[in-house]
């Protein structure tokens, strides 16, 4: 079972539908009293997009700290930013708001999440915050071709991954494959 932590975002159930193609999925809000109990039972954790700054998103950052190294973790948009922040990265406002904007990305490091996906593929972006400084134990897996923003990260030793873009959006045609790869190759 994959536990999808909902950061009060309208895309959460699109993401749940994608995950549900490959595994049982349970959705709980980021402030639900049962989060830790259900996370213990889960095979992997996915932190959804959401509004605002990661530090204000319920129990998300605490959960990332508590489950890092114990459960595979995937963060999307706000979840991606939270992973970076928890591990010592720095966030900042994007020079240009990227709500509903499509970019192409180039891979910078090999990642199991990009298996079967061509370099340069299109992704949909909905963010005004981004990673400015990477955490030491992480590597950049993808950058946007138009503004060189960090679009993908992974921990160097643990099964922890992040996407700044929205794989569940129709504007990310290959997004389903990344979700599949997380579940089939990482969570297993």
Where are these regions (language model features)?
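Short amphipathic alpha-helix with an adjacent loop that forms part of the alpha/beta core around
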Residues: 33-42
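Structural signature of beta-strand start/N-cap positions in the alpha/beta core
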Residues: 1, 24, 43-44, 72-74, ...
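Acyltransferase
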Residues: 169-188
């Amino acid at each position: 079972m994959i536990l999808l932590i909902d950061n009060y975002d309208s895309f959460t159930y699109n993401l749940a539908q994608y995950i549900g193609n490959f595994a049982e999925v349970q959705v709980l809000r980021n402030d639900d009293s049962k989060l830790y109990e259900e996370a213990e039972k889960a095979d992997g954790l996915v932190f959804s997009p959401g509004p605002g700054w990661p530090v204000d998103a319920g129990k998300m950052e605490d959960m990332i700290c508590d489950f890092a190294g114990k459960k595979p973790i995937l963060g999307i948009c706000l979840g991606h930013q939270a992973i970076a922040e928890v591990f010592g990265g720095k966030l900042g406002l994007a020079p240009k708001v990227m709500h509903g904007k499509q970019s192409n990305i180039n891979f910078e490091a090999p990642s199991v999440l990009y298996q079967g996906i061509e370099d340069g593929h299109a992704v949909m972006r909905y963010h005004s915050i981004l990673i400015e400084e990477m955490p030491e134990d992480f590597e950049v897996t993808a950058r946007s071709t138009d503004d060189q923003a960090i679009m993908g990260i992974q921990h160097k030793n643990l099964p922890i991954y992040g996407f700044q873009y929205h794989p569940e959006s129709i504007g990310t045609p290959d997004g389903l494959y990344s979700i599949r790869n997380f579940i089939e190759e990482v969570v297993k």
